[in-house]
Swiss-Prot record:
Family statement: Belongs to the universal ribosomal protein uL18 family.
Biological process per Gene Ontology, one example term: translation
Phylogenetic placement of the source organism: Bacteria, Pseudomonadati, Pseudomonadota, Alphaproteobacteria, Caulobacterales
Gene Ontology MF term list: 5S rRNA binding; structural constituent of ribosome
Quaternary structure annotation from Swiss-Prot or TrEMBL: Part of the 50S ribosomal subunit; part of the 5S rRNA/L5/L18/L25 subcomplex. Contacts the 5S and 23S rRNAs.
Protein name: Large ribosomal subunit protein uL18
Organism (species): Caulobacter sp. (strain K31)
PANTHER family on file: 39S RIBOSOMAL PROTEIN L18, MITOCHONDRIAL, LARGE RIBOSOMAL SUBUNIT PROTEIN UL18M
Recorded name of the encoding gene: rplR
Tree of life domain: Bacteria
């Protein structure tokens, strides 16, 4: 039986997360969620089950930008700055099943430029 688009997306995200768990070596995960109108990023410590830092296009300067590449880059910069304040510099990038292109790539590049290593 064919999977619905939603079920396919959930499976892709789970497959990505399983691979990341094997590669992470205890590093926190920079998780990205992309909707049609916003983009969200969280730095998550999976061992403790705690979100260390987060940012989205719903807050601050990014709220006026919408969900384009510029807004995604701003979110990447914000989440990187907040993670570094908490003492986190090394993370594993969890693209959540999304293709590494466009807004997801812009967020990742901005986070790298702001000082996160992945």
């Amino acid at each position: 039986m064919a999977l619905s688009p939603r079920e396919s997306a959930v499976r892709r995200a789970q497959r990505t997360r399983t691979r990341l768990k094997a590669l992470s070596n205890g590093r926190p995960r920079l998780s990205v969620f992309r909707s049609s109108k916003n983009i969200y990023a969280q730095v998550i410590d999976d061992e403790r089950g705690v979100t260390l830092a987060s940012a989205s296009t719903l807050e601050g300067e990014a709220a006026t930008k919408g969900a384009d590449k510029d807004a995604a880059a701003l979110v990447g910069k914000l989440v990187a700055e907040r993670a570094i304040e908490k003492g986190v510099k090394d993370v594993v990038f969890d693209r959540g099943g999304y293709i590494f292109h466009g807004r997801v790539k812009a967020l990742a590049d901005a986070a790298r430029e702001a000082g996160l290593n992945f």
